[in-house]
Amino acid sequence: MEDIQNSASNADLSAAQRQVRVQLTSKQEDIALPDGTGPILVPTGLRRYALSTLVNNLLSNDKPIPFEFLINGTFLRTSIDEYLTANGISAETTLEIEYVRALIPPLHIASFQHDDWVSSTDVLSATSPAATWASAAISPGQERILSGSYDGLLRVWNMSSQVVATSPPAADGGHAASIKAAKFVTPNQIVSAGLDRTVRLWKYSESEDGFSGTIAPHLELYGHKSGINSLAVHAPSHRLLSASSDHSVGFWSTKKSDAPAAPENLLPSAAARSSKRRKLNSSVSVAQRGPVALLSSHTAPVSAAIFDAKDSTVGYSTSWDHSLRTWDLVTATLVDTRTASHSLLSLEHLPELSLLAAGTSARHITLIDPRASATTISAMTLRGHTNAVVSLARDPHSTYGLISGSHDGTCRIWDIRATKADKDGVVGESVYTISRKGLEEQGKADSKRVGGEGVKVFSVCWDKTIGIVSAGEDKRIQINRGEGMLSA
C-alpha cells in the first residue's frame, strides 16, 4: 500500500516538476493580455485555480477575476499534465490555452404569481427580437414580460411584478381554452395560440403613464384541427409558424391583406351551427383568416416549429414521431427528415455552430446538424435532466450557450464546450442548474423531484437585458440573472 502511495506521490511530483510552454489568449478585449505577450513556461501540474491566479497576476488585477480555460475548444477539468496524457500531446509542444470569465451564478430576481399554470413566456426589452426587429427604443425600466396561462388569459407585466394588461375572456374575443404559446411580434402586437386550435393576433397599447394597457383582438387565424403547442415569429417577413397536435405545421401571415380566407368548416360559426350552441365571441367582430400553408408530413403531434435564424425561408419542426424535419417555406415542401431515437419535444437553432438543439422525452438534449452533408444524426448529447426537456432558448451573450426547461422542475444552462467522453460519444454537462424559488421558500430546495411534481417548467426565455425568464406548473414566472455568464 505504501509503495502505491509513494508511486502516486512521485507521479504528482514529477508532473509538478515537468514544464510546458503555454500561450494564453482571450477573445474578450477587456481581459486580454497585452499584445506581444509570448509563451510562458508553467508546471504541468497546474489546474484551473492556479492558472486563474497566474492570469490575474499577469493582468495586475487588484480584484481577482475567476477564469475558466479552454484547450482545443474544450474546458480544462484536470491538471495540464492529465490533459496532455489523455490527449496524447507532447509536453514539448506550445499549448494554446484560451481563458474566459468563469460562470456567474444566475441569481433569483423576482417571481410573478398567477392563478393557474403558466405555459408560455416572452419578453419585450431593448435587446429582445420584437424590439430590435421594429427598431424600437425600450427605455430601462420599461421592459415588459408576457405570460400565457392555462386559464386562457394573456398578461403583460412590468418589472415591478404588476399586471399592466390582461387579454379579454372568450366571450369578448379571447381564447376559449388554455393558452400554450405566446410571443411579442412587435412592441404593439402579440400572438398567442393554444388548445382552442386558433392562432390569435392582438394589438397591445399602454396608457401614457405605463401603468395600464389593453390587449385587443386583431386577427383570428384558423386552420388547425387540434391544439397548438408552440409558435415562432419572424416579424420582418410578417410570418408565423405553429406546431399542432393535428400532426401539421402552420405557416401564417400576420397581415390581413396577405392571408387567405379562413376555412369555413373550422370557424366558430360552423361549430355553433352544427352543435346548435350559442355562438362564442358574439360581442366582438374580429377578422378571420386561414394559413398561407399547412405543412403535413409528421405522423404524430408536432411539438415545435421554428424559423432558421439566418434564413427565414427555411423552417424546422420536431415531433413525437421522433423526427426533425426541414421545410422550404417558399414552396411549402419538405426538404429533409432526420430521425432520432426518441420523441422530440422542443427545438432551438444555434446558427453560428450550424446546429439544432432538440429536447427529448428521454431527458436529454440532442444536437443535430441539419445540413445535407452531415453524416451522423446526433453531433452531441447534453445530459443532466431527470425528466422531459420541453423548452429551449439560446444564450444571447454566447454562441455556445443554451438553456433548457424541463418537467423535472429545473432549468439548466449549458456551454457546449463543457464536455466529457462517454460510452455514447461526446456528452455535454450543464454548467448551472436553476431550481424553482417556491421550493426554496418552502425549505425544500434540496428535495429530489424526478417527476417535477408541482414545479414542472413549461417555458424558458433568455434575454440580454432582463435575464432568464421561466414559467411553469408552480403558477409563477421566475426571473434569474447572471451577467455574461458564458464567454462569446
Swiss-Prot record:
BP GO annotations: chromosome organization; maturation of 5.8S rRNA from tricistronic rRNA transcript (SSU-rRNA, 5.8S rRNA, LSU-rRNA); maturation of LSU-rRNA from tricistronic rRNA transcript (SSU-rRNA, 5.8S rRNA, LSU-rRNA); protein-RNA complex remodeling
Keyword flag Zinc-finger: no
Keywords linked to the UniProt accession: Nucleus, Repeat, Ribosome biogenesis, rRNA processing, WD repeat
GO molecular function, one term: ribonucleoprotein complex binding
One Pfam family cited in the UniProt record for this chain: NLE
Entry's Gene Ontology cellular component terms: nucleoplasm; PeBoW complex; preribosome, large subunit precursor
Entry-linked Gene3D superfamilies: YVTN repeat-like/Quinoprotein amine dehydrogenase
Predominant subcellular localization, coarse grouping: nucleus
Stretches forming WD repeats: 128-167, 174-212, 223-262, 297-337, 339-378, 384-424, 452-488
Protein name, entry field: Ribosome biogenesis protein ytm1
Species in which this protein is naturally found: Aspergillus clavatus (strain ATCC 1007 / CBS 513.65 / DSM 816 / NCTC 3887 / NRRL 1 / QM 1276 / 107)
